[in-house]
């Protein structure tokens, strides 16, 4: 199942690459994604934060870093890969959506499964963690756990935006 969403994401990345090659402002990208959705009868959602763009489909998310100046302060996708690797070593990987790097046309794209939030309230992610999980998250400086940055997988909290802030 994992490779299925990654394979589908890799097929969509050339389209994203074209859109990003001539658009540098979020509102232009959003407009192009809207036109793509109409043309292809798709429902791709475009979102952006301080350092990353996200292209969200029903079963996967593709992230790409764009604001390289702020990555040191706010974290980027490579930071998520490092956090996940440490979580794997410590047996906490189940807390995080696994992110996979895919290089295409000189740009690194990061693919993760779509995790759905159900009935999330802002800043209550910590209430859903065990003492050990909470300690690990705090020890590794994982912040910004509001309702857009976590969801539920197999009845357990799953963090989807987890760059550490040092």
Q: What positions do the PLM features span?
A:
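ATP-binding glycine-rich loop module of kinase domains
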Residues: 40-90
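Catalytic activation segment of kinase domains across protein kinase-like and atypical kinase folds
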Residues: 141-166
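Protein kinase catalytic-loop region centered on the HRD/HxD motif
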Residues: 134-141
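Generic beta-strand structural signal
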Residues: 56-57, 104, 152
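Active-site Asp-x-Gly
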Residues: 73, 123-127, 163-166
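Conserved structural core of kinase catalytic domains
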Residues: 60, 65-68, 85-131
């Amino acid at each position: 199942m994992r490779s299925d969403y990654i394979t589908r994401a890799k097929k969509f990345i050339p389209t994203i690459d074209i859109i990003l090659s001539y658009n540098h402002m979020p509102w232009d990208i959003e407009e192009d994604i809207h036109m793509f959705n109409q043309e292809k009868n798709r429902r791709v959602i475009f979102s952006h934060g301080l350092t990353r763009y996200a292209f969200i489909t029903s079963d996967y998310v593709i992230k790409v870093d764009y604001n390289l100046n702020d990555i040191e302060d706010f974290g980027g996708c490579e930071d998520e890969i490092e956090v996940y690797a440490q979580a794997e070593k410590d047996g906490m990987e189940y807390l995080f959506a696994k992110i996979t790097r895919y290089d295409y046309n000189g740009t690194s794209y990061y693919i993760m499964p779509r995790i759905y939030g159900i009935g999330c309230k802002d800043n209550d992610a910590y209430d859903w963690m065990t003492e050990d999980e909470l300690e690990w998250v705090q020890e590794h400086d994982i912040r910004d756990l509001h309702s857009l940055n976590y969801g539920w997988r197999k009845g357990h909290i799953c963090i989807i935006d987890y760059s550490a802030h040092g």
